[in-house]
Regions:
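Hydrophobic alpha-helical segments
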Residues: 1-93
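Residues within alpha-helical transmembrane segments of multi-pass membrane proteins, especially transporters
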Residues: 10-14, 92, 96, 100, ...
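Non-transmembrane, membrane-proximal soluble domains of secreted or membrane proteins
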Residues: 34-37, 62-89, 102-339
Length: 339
């Protein structure tokens, strides 16, 4: 039904446009429209341009305010606050340029509409004007790029994130697995050739640092602790995306990527901030990796350091040998079934 209404409206507009063309052609052929009528038409079209301009700007402002509630909440990581500040600065610059250029464009179209008593002034160049609109954007863009690069260097510089807790995030179609280093805070080596049903990450059992590694299907993180996220993929390119922490890094088969960040807001606190008792942090795949890409996500839980230690203590090491059932007593007499 909605499609039919849309098609009817489009068809009606096309009919009106064609009728206007026919009417204009008839007027020109008959010589009925004089310069006074043309000037009137120009004034009307100019007024319509200004109406369209302000209606569009007001509607845009309304849409920004109306749908702001669907944006991400405050950043839940230390660097995320700085990233948001940089983004806000970009938005301010973009809105300023957008409003300025659109207002000038439509105002000039109205002010300098055709007038029989005025002739257009033509000039082929203006060095001063070209210098202004070249130098100013260059300075603004250079400032934005420089601040962005400096912040990115702070995020990726390993020397500024020493003594961080190592967590491996391992992606495959179509799920994530987390691996935690034990007390030594060192992840064991892994190799895809060692992957089995009982060793899905291919952890090298000969590496002593892996004896206390822990595997989990939920990503638990302690608040206020530097995290070194080690990212790997088994099959295709994935992308570990934690939107609430402003974190994203590709997971590429055959290589290891890393991301350093520090969570600053626990899950419980974010529930209070958002007013949503069911709020959960989540890690998504932000690369289209196959038919079930949309379902590739992992729950992320941020807790106090004491809670994290208690949770980690209750988890079993990934390479812990399962308990072996006691051997049958060979000296026991066989039991004869009752007849």
């Amino acid at each position: 039904m909605n499609l039919l209404i849309f098609l009817a409206v489009v068809f009606g507009i096309l009919v009106l446009v064609r009728l206007a063309d026919v009417a204009g052609l008839a007027s020109r052929l008959s010589g009925e429209k004089d310069e006074t009528e043309q000037d009137k038409d120009n004034r009307i079209n100019g007024a319509l341009l200004l109406t369209f301009l302000w209606a569009g700007l007001i509607l845009m402002i309304y849409m920004v305010l109306r749908y702001k509630q669907f944006m991400l909440p405050v950043a839940a990581s230390e660097h995320g606050v700085k990233v948001d500040n940089l983004m806000n600065i970009n938005w301010i610059v973009l809105f300023a340029v957008f409003f300025l250029t659109q207002i000038l464009l439509f105002t000039f179209a109205f002010k300098y509409r055709y007038n029989k008593n005025r002739r257009a002034y033509y000039f082929h160049d203006n060095n001063k004007l070209e210098a202004i609109w070249t130098i100013i954007p260059t300075i603004v863009l250079a400032a934005l790029i420089t601040t962005g690069l400096l912040e990115w260097n702070n995020i990726t510089d390993p020397d500024k994130h020493k003594n961080g807790m190592q967590v491996q995030v391992y992606g495959k179609q179509f799920d994530w697995t987390a691996r935690y280093a034990g007390k030594d805070n060192q992840l064991a080596r892994s190799d895809f050739r060692m992957i089995t049903d009982v060793n899905p990450l291919g952890i090298d059992a000969s590496d002593k640092s892996g004896k206390d590694d822990i595997i989990a299907k939920e990503l638990y993180l302690p608040v206020g602790v530097n995290i070194e996220m080690v990212i790997n993929s088994r099959d295709v390119i994935h992308s570990a995306f934690l939107p609430h922490f402003r974190v994203q890094m590709n997971a590429v088969p055959g290589m290891t990527t890393r991301f350093h960040f520090k969570p600053t807001i626990t899950t419980a606190r974010m529930r209070e901030i958002t007013g949503n008792e069911k709020f959960e942090y989540v890690m998504l795949c932000n690369k289209i990796c196959g038919v079930a890409h949309y379902n590739m996500k992992m729950k992320v839980v941020v807790v106090e350091p004491q809670e994290f230690k208690a949770w980690l203590k209750n988890e079993k090491p990934a390479l812990e040998k399962p308990a072996v059932a006691p051997a049958a007593d060979s000296t026991a007499k066989p039991v004869t079934a009752l007849k």
